[in-house]
């Protein structure tokens, strides 16, 4: 009864979100380093498999955790801005969770002794990520998250950033501080540029090397069409013809 109503709410909200995303012309910054084939299919408006309401609620929980942490940090007076959109440009769009900075008394007034030296007034881009307890903490920080943070540092012209992870199961917090890495940013931007060329030339990218064991493959919304496309690059027009043939055979 209530379950059906709640599930329907999440499914309809996700459909509306996808409708809005269909008109996009730029990459989302969170896609840095993600599966190129998945991104290609999203740009080509390929019908995606429906995401289970349970997973949608998990995604929402991550947003709730982010807001909760930001409220705590705001109360400490260290947050300078939240939900900051990167400057408009042709390739990428996105917004950072927050920019924070500290005074020389931020920690001492609370009786906190830090081993590392904190420079007063220096801004840090903050990205908050919630993770499952199934993720081995030794694997943190995740490469995709590092790519995303480095792009924020690049577009905001800020030299330092913080990746803050909160384990949803244990509530343990882990943080990593990064300096701006120009070489990494150039590699990521080049990766995006090459993917844009494939999208514009209608070339479906190669499958992930560790398919189907990569974590992105486990519940991918394009798993069936990815199987049809095969391992190597394929023209988008040829793939569409392959899909049409299979649809005709199934009728």
Region annotations inferred by a language model:
Residues 121, 145-148, 188:
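Amphipathic alpha-helical interface surfaces
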Residues 141-155:
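Short, charged, amphipathic alpha-helix that recurs within catalytic cores of restriction-modification
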Residues 69-73, 77, 153-156, 196-199:
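Hydrophobic, Leu/Ile/Phe/Ala-enriched alpha-helical segments that form helix-helix packing faces
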Residues 35, 152, 220:
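A residue-level signal for conserved active-site and pocket-lining positions in enzyme catalytic cores
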Residues 128-130, 165:
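Residue-level recognition of conserved beta-strand positions in structured domain cores
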Residues 138-140, 155-251:
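Metal-dependent nuclease catalytic regions and adjoining charged, substrate-binding loops involved
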Residues 1-125, 132-134, 143, 240-244, ...:
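Metal-dependent nuclease catalytic cores that hydrolyze phosphodiester bonds in DNA/RNA
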């Amino acid at each position: 009864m209530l379950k059906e109503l709640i599930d329907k709410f999440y499914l309809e909200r996700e459909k509306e979100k996808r409708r809005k995303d269909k008109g996009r012309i730029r990459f989302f910054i969170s896609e840095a380093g993600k599966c190129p084939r998945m991104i290609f299919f999203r740009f080509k408006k390929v019908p995606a498999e429906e995401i289970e309401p349970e997973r949608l609620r998990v995604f929402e929980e991550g947003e709730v955790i982010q807001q909760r942490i930001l409220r705590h940090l705001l109360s400490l007076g260290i947050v300078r801005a939240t939900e900051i959109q990167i400057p408009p440009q042709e390739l990428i769009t996105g917004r950072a969770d927050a920019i924070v900075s500290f005074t020389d008394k931020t920690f001492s007034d609370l009786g906190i002794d830090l081993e590392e030296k904190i420079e007063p007034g220096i801004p840090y881009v903050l990205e908050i990520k919630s993770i499952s307890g199934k993720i081995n903490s030794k694997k943190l920080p995740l490469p995709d998250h590092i790519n995303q943070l480095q792009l924020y540092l690049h577009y905001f012209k800020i030299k330092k950033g913080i990746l803050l992870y909160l384990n949803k199961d244990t509530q343990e917090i882990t943080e990593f501080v990064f300096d701006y890495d120009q070489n990494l940013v150039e590699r990521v931007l080049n990766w995006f540029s090459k993917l844009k060329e494939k999208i514009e030339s209608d070339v479906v990218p190669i499958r992930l090397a560790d398919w189907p064991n990569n974590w992105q493959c486990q519940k991918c919304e394009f798993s069936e069409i990815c199987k049809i496309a095969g391992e190597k690059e394929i023209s988008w027009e040829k793939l569409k013809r392959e899909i049409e043939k299979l649809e005709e055979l199934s009728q």
